[in-house]
């Protein structure tokens, strides 16, 4: 590997392997094991739609002898070859795990029945269900004589069908049917004996009814297998000349349907002649990812598996933060002291309540907020619209380039503007990823401000499963600097200078990288002076070479470095094997570890930050991101305690090293520590 760094895409696949480990873990509830299979599948879909698509574009440019205006650590062709090897190996492991889970389901009297195993009453049910519910959505496509295939949807599941008469095997027809799972759902509960839950998949209902669908052909043999294609989903804004930014996004979303196939996944028992025909018509080449699999595909739907399993250990419900247990008005609390919410342990109510209260408070003048990914039927947007209706000045910076949320955000933009909300969108070549809010109100004839700075999205639904931190504050120094960010977001089109340098906040792309380097250098200096020195960083991903090199210098100087990285870590070979080895772990459990936290020992007077930014080039150089120092002593201790709990995890923590083995941290007969459970106990005991 060039520069001895692990390529980011190979590191990401190693992260997805950790998700697969959860599906394989017998200590995880069966319901969650199935959910993790769905997460693994959904993750891989997005990986191919974005990362593999990008690598394939690079290969095309190289083939055309065009230069790449991008720094990569390895040849795209070599990375694609390695991806194919890893994905095929993971697909085999996935199939093995699913077979084991299926056996466990049968033990629990949950049976997934295919079209060949229906009893008489189930056959009648499936026939009637097809006529009543499914048939209006079925559009058979006869394809054997077409010069090219009709449009096939990205992410949709298809049945590829060979029809023939047993008496004349040479007279065949090929057909395709799109499985309408988006319209009517993938899973159907069948009538079954008492105490048993029988489930059939929608594609098997369609298979059972193929003789009816194609009755006019008089065929008596049908061979049907599923496949799906994944398409390039990148939006190329530079190609849309003459359009404004919103029009470019809108057209880019529509153009996704024209994306080239980057992956073809199929049932390995598919008719060989039909398989070759599809590969030829889809213009798939040796560079394409053609992946054989089992009978079931699009496992992402299994994240919504029917609720037929009763589990002993259900996920604990979020609880109120102690500051809000007495239903006190949120603004009253924040104006007196800082509060930090830790999701999903704490409930999300204070964030929604803060906005709802502001919407109805006669003394509130304005609300400024950033939005990246929002919940459907968003309570946040509802509160902001209510505020605008009540005469408040509401400004929302809505990031239209949030990948796969572009269409939803365009709809939110239209809705909010119709209600009088000022919606700002689009800075060229920059995404606004910071999670910040400021509310201004009058208190006793004085203007005061309060708001929040968060690591997670304004999304009350994902807040139930994403582990994030949100600082509610009225600190004047912090909010004055947050205001500078909003001023820039509002006025950049007027040619305003970039955000001024700040004393407290670390802001990308202005100061964050240099500030982090300075903080690392301080620890190096302390180590050389003989002081205990330590850096602890928790991130989703760490792939920035400059900061990795800086950490390498810190290790050589004797600084203890702890990394808690959920996803990508492009570790330099040997960093974990040096005299002062790096301690790098990844925690994958029932909650998705989404928070970014930085702790610098600072001779015992720790400097602690929460941040919206990962340590990646895109976050540090091409996004507006905000990291905030934790100034409140109690909150600082609380956050350090939570991170220390995670560093002690010996149940769900994996060791991150350049071998990518994902070995679990050994418990070595010590007390078993499952950090998400321990964090729940720690926080629920707080007063």
Q: Would you name each region that the model predicts?
A:
Residues 547, 551-553:
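Polyanion-binding catalytic cores of nucleic-acid enzymes and NTP/SAM-utilizing transferases
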Residues 377, 546-547:
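Low-complexity, intrinsically disordered short segments enriched for Gly/Pro and polybasic residues
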Residues 1-535, 553-557, 569-687:
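N-terminal localization/anchoring segments of enzymes in phospholipid and broader phosphate metabolism
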Residues 563-567:
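A cross-kingdom feature strongest in bacterial/archaeal respiratory oxidoreductases
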């Amino acid at each position: 590997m060039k520069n001895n760094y692990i390529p980011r895409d190979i590191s990401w696949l190693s992260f997805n392997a950790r998700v697969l480990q959860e599906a394989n873990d017998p200590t995880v509830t069966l319901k969650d094991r199935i959910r993790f299979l769905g997460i693994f599948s959904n993750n891989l879909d997005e990986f191919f739609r974005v990362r593999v698509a990008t690598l394939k574009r690079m290969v095309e440019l190289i083939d055309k002898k065009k230069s790449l205006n991008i720094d990569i650590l390895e040849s795209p062709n070599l990375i694609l070859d390695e991806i194919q090897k890893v994905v095929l190996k993971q697909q085999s492991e996935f199939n093995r795990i699913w077979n084991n889970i299926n056996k466990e389901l049968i033990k629990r009297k949950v049976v997934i029945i295919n079209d060949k195993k229906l009893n008489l009453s189930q056959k009648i049910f499936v026939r009637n269900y097809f006529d009543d519910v499914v048939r209006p959505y079925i559009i058979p496509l006869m394809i054997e004589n077409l010069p090219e295939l009709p449009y096939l949807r990205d992410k949709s599941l298809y049945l590829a069908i060979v029809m023939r008469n047993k008496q004349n095997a040479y007279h065949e027809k090929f057909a395709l049917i799109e499985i309408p799972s988006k319209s009517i759902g993938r899973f159907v509960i069948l009538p079954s004996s008492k105490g048993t839950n029988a489930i059939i998949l929608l594609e098997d209902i369609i298979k059972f009814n193929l003789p009816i669908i194609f009755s006019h052909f008089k065929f008596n043999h049908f061979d049907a297998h599923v496949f799906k294609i994944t398409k390039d989903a990148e939006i190329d804004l530079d190609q849309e000349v003459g359009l404004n930014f919103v029009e470019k996004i809108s057209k880019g979303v529509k153009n996704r349907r024209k994306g080239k196939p980057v992956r073809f996944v199929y049932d390995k028992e598919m008719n060989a002649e039909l398989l070759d025909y599809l590969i030829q018509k889809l213009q798939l080449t040796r560079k394409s990812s053609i992946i054989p699999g089992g009978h079931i595909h699009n496992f992402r739907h299994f994240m919504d598996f029917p609720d037929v399993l009763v589990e002993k250990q259900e996920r604990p419900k979020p609880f109120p933060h102690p500051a809000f247990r007495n239903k006190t008005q949120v603004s009253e609390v924040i104006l007196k002291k800082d509060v930090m919410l830790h999701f999903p342990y704490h409930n999300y109510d204070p964030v929604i309540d803060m906005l709802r209260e502001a919407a109805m408070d006669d003394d509130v003048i304005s609300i400024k907020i950033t939005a990246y990914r929002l919940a459907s039927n968003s309570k946040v947007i509802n509160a902001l619209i209510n505020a605008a209706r009540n005469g408040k000045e509401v400004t929302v910076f809505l990031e239209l380039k949030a990948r796969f949320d572009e269409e939803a955000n365009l709809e939110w933009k239209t809705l909010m503007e119709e209600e009088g909300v000022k919606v700002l969108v689009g800075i060229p070549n920059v995404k606004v990823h910071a999670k910040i809010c400021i509310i201004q109100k009058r208190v006793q004839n004085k203007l005061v401000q309060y708001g929040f700075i968060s690591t997670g999205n304004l999304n009350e639904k994902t807040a139930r499963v994403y582990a994030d931190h949100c600082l509610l504050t009225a600190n004047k120094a912090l909010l004055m600097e947050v205001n500078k960010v909003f001023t820039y977001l509002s006025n950049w089109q007027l040619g305003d200078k970039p955000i001024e340098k700040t004393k407290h906040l670390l802001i990308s792309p202005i100061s964050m990288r240099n500030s982090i380097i300075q903080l690392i250098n301080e620890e190096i200096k302390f180590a050389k002076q003989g002081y205990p020195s330590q850096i602890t960083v928790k991130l989703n991903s760490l792939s920035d070479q400059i900061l990795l090199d800086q950490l390498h210098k810190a290790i050589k100087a004797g600084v203890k470095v702890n990394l808690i990285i959920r996803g990508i870590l492009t570790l330099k070979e040997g960093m974990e094997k040096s005299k002062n080895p790096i301690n790098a772990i990844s925690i994958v459990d029932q909650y998705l570890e989404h928070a970014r936290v930085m702790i610098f020992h600072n001779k015992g007077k720790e400097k602690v930050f929460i941040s919206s930014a990962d340590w990646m080039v895109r976050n540090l150089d091409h996004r507006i991101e905000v990291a905030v120092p934790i100034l409140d002593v109690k909150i600082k201790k609380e956050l350090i305690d939570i991170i220390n709990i995670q560093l002690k995890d010996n149940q769900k923590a994996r060791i991150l090293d350049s071998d990518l083995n994902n070995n679990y941290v050994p418990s070595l007969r010590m007390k078993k520590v499952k950090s998400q459970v321990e964090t729940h106990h720690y926080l629920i005991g707080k007063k």
